[in-house]
Amino acid sequence: MAHKKGVGSSRNGRDSNPKMLGVKRFGGERVKPGMIIVRQRGTKFKPGANVGLGRDYTIYSLIDGVVTFEQHSRNQKRVSVYAAE
């Protein structure tokens, strides 16, 4: 049987760096323009009012205000920022 054995340690050892994805500012939190609200892969959250969508699908605030997460459809969430009173 010509099987290679015992070379596991030299062939293992690959792992990607963490990407720090996820929600950075939650509903009800105050944000300023340019603050990142969500970092994501693809549009898990869709942009709503007063937010921008970056090239890597990062959602960020365009105005001073409060973050809200709204149910857009059955399986879609929308992130908006509304001006604080």
UniProtKB/Swiss-Prot annotation:
GO molecular function, one term: structural constituent of ribosome
GO biological process: translation
Region annotation (Disordered) ranges: 1-25
PROSITE patterns, sorted: RIBOSOMAL_L27 (PS00831)
Keyword Ribonucleoprotein: yes
Signal peptide range in chain numbering: none
Source domain of life: Bacteria
Keywords: Ribonucleoprotein, Ribosomal protein
GO annotation, cellular component aspect: cytosolic large ribosomal subunit
InterPro entries: Ribosomal_bL27, Ribosomal_bL27_CS
Similarity comment: family membership: Belongs to the bacterial ribosomal protein bL27 family.
Name the record gives this protein: Large ribosomal subunit protein bL27
Organism: Roseiflexus castenholzii (strain DSM 13941 / HLO8)
Lineage, top ranks: Bacteria, Bacillati, Chloroflexota, Chloroflexia, Chloroflexales
